[in-house]
Amino acid sequence: MLSHIVDILADPNDGTALSGADDFSRLVSESGHSYDVAKQGYVTLAAGAGLKHKGDDMDMVNARETYLAMGHFAPFVEAVTGAVQDGLDSASLAESTPASLLEVGAGTGYYLAHTLDSIAEARGVGLDISPHAAKHLAKCHPRVGAVVADVWERLPIQDESVDA
């Protein structure tokens, strides 16, 4: 949900902070840029002329989700979750602040959702270039905010805003 992670996000044009407007139907930057939130719950944060690449199409995203649901990658998701937990355990995080996680190339949110299930109160930002993947990502977990962005450009993330 974008309202849970908006403080992590940044305007892709100039890095200024974003805030929700019009009941979070838009995100607006301090410098006046505005980004519409899709009805499916994700936001596209692209600078200038927009995204240069399209990412996975709907068939590719559906095929990936079907394959992941078969459990073939269960050992990998367990390893990723364990590594994130170890990293957070060794970090000096304030106990009163929930951990903030970022997954770049998040796809449908398979890894991020599983990791959030294992880390109480943590919140996550999933970035992917595919709007089709972002539709799934936005629904994968109640503590995930889904963002369509080109990771070859400036990440739309505030400096020092994520823990893992």
What does each model-identified segment do?
Residues 142-153:
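Conserved SAM-binding strand-loop segment of SAM-dependent methyltransferases
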Residues 108-120:
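Conserved SAM-binding loop of SAM-dependent methyltransferases across substrates and taxa
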Residues 1-54:
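N-terminal auxiliary segments of SAM/dcSAM-dependent transferases
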Residues 128-132:
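Conserved SAM/SAH-binding beta-strand->alpha-helix loop
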Residues 71-96:
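Conserved alpha-helix/loop element of class I SAM-dependent methyltransferases that forms part
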Residues 96-107:
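Conserved class I S-adenosyl-L-methionine
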Residues 152-164:
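A short acidic, Gly/Pro-enriched loop at the edge of an enzyme's catalytic core
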Residues 55-79:
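Class I SAM-dependent methyltransferase Rossmann-like catalytic core
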